[in-house]
């Protein structure tokens, strides 16, 4: 999935909250949010700014998961599926350029709802597709404040 950056320190010592500081240059064993927008970009000058705004929408959700005490493995899995969701949203804005002008929150809410996320063509199997949809539903509930993560 996304590019993973490993820390030079022992990953077992990193708390989930510390992992979320990758965007502040501290590194982590699985998250490096600053590189996500670039990894999604088919057209860097157009896609990176949109991608960066999407990442900013993901950060409070990931932070809430970390604060709720979710395990590193669960955080990593959620992050992987969020990375996939971001890629699908960017693919969509390349097909519908007018959507590039939408605020990131609105753009995301056009792609996720109480049933899950957009079609994800890179799912290896039904289990991955179901897990992806579960994360999208959880993000939707978080963004619409219907439920905490």
Regions found by a protein language model. Name each.
Residues 1-149:
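Charge-rich, intrinsically disordered N-terminal extensions
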């Amino acid at each position: 999935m996304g590019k993973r950056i490993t820390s030079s320190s022992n990953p077992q010592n990193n708390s989930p909250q510390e992992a979320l500081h990758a965007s502040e240059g501290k590194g982590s064993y699985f998250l490096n949010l600053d590189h996500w927008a670039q990894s999604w970009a088919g057209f860097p000058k157009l896609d990176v700014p949109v991608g960066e705004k999407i990442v900013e929408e993901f950060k409070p959700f990931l932070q809430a998961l970390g604060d709720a005490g979710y395990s590193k493995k669960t955080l990593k899995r959620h992050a992987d599926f969020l990375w996939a969701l971001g890629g699908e949203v960017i693919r969509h804005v390349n097909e519908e350029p007018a959507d590039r002008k939408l605020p990131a929150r609105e753009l995301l809410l056009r792609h996720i709802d109480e049933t899950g996320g957009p079609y994800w063509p890179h799912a290896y199997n039904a289990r991955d597709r179901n897990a992806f949809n579960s994360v999208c539903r959880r993000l939707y509930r978080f963004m619409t404040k219907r439920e905490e993560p």
